[in-house]
């Protein structure tokens, strides 16, 4: 089950985000398709919800592979930290497990899931911060320490 109950009927979902860092200190970021209902065209790192029976690590490996074509299951790196988001009004409460993988990948290794992702780039931490400063990078305040 991908939901975690916590007191007074609050339900929290488990989400995952997977960051890929290259030896040149750039990170793989992807751009959401313009047809997304929420935050179309915004930049992000790969991720999504855990499915029933899936561990957090299995979920991040699946999500990164689905969205980018990159298999992180045997990459150096791994779990970094978790954060919690509380939004009881919208019943959108979740925990997010953050993973960072160190991989020497190139543009040729990327095969985007076109239903979800419009584009990608390899960006430095400074470039990602600049995108976030424009309000165009999702979850930046919650995950920024992973880019250090």
Predicted regions and their residues:
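Nudix hydrolase/Nudix homology domain
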Residues: 36, 40-41, 81-86, 90-148
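The catalytic Nudix box helix
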Residues: 45-78
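Beta-hairpin (beta-strand-turn-beta-strand) motif
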Residues: 23, 32-35, 48-50, 55, ...
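Single conserved hydrophobic/aromatic residue that forms the stacking wall/gate
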Residues: 1-8, 12
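A structural signal for short, well-ordered beta-strand segments
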Residues: 4, 18, 46, 99-101
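A glycine-rich, hydrophobic loop/mini-helix early in the fold
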Residues: 17-47
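Short, cationic motifs built from Arg/Lys/His that form the positively charged side of catalytic pockets
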Residues: 32, 62-66, 121
């Amino acid at each position: 089950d991908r939901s975690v109950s916590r007191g007074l009927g609050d339900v929290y979902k488990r989400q995952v985000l997977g960051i890929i860092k290259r030896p040149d200190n750039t990170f793989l970021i992807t751009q959401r398709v313009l047809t997304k209902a929420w935050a179309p065209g915004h930049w992000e790192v790969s991720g999504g919800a855990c499915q029933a029976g899936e561990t957090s690590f299995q979920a991040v490996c699946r999500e990164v592979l689905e969205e980018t074509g990159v298999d992180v299951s045997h990459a150096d790196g791994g779990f970094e930290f978790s954060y919690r988001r509380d939004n009881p009004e919208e019943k959108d409460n979740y925990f997010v497990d953050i993973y960072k993988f160190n991989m020497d990948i190139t543009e040729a290794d990327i095969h985007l899931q076109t239903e979800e992702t419009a584009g990608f780039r390899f960006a430095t931490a400074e470039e990602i911060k600049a995108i976030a400063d424009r309000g165009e990078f999702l979850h930046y305040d919650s995950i920024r320490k992973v880019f250090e």
